[in-house]
């Protein structure tokens, strides 16, 4: 449709989009704003931002990586290529004897093969 064509070509002032992190690490979300990232729907491109993410990916020092991610996030906040309007939220009522429910479940998928009940 016309909306999707305009969005795909970058011919928009405001468009709806969504982003999920596939893993628990800042780069899961931040990489989508790199200049050449295929998931960069915003058109945002800042070589300084890309450089900070590359430095973070290259370092083994966790504290240094965190600092680099903070700098990259600050650039996004200063330049605001996307406006977070809402966040997905999932709530579930779970029997207290249910075990095997994943704790870090980013996309909400539950593998029922891992579930079981236990009184302990």
What are these regions (language model features)?
Residues 1-2:
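Short acidic loop-to-helix transition motifs that present clustered carboxylates
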Residues 5-120:
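Detector for C-terminal structural segments
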């Amino acid at each position: 449709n016309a909306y999707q064509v305009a969005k795909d070509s970058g011919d928009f002032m405001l468009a709806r989009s969504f982003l999920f992190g596939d893993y628990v690490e800042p780069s899961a979300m931040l990489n989508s704003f790199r200049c050449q990232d295929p998931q960069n729907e915003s058109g945002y491109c800042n070589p300084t931002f890309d450089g900070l993410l590359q430095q973070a990916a290259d370092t083994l020092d966790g504290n240094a990586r965190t600092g680099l991610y903070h700098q990259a996030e600050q650039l996004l906040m200063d330049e605001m290529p996307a406006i977070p309007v809402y966040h997905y939220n999932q709530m579930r009522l779970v029997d207290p004897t249910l075990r095997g429910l994943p704790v870090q479940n980013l996309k909400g998928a539950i593998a029922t093969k891992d579930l079981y009940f236990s009184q302990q």
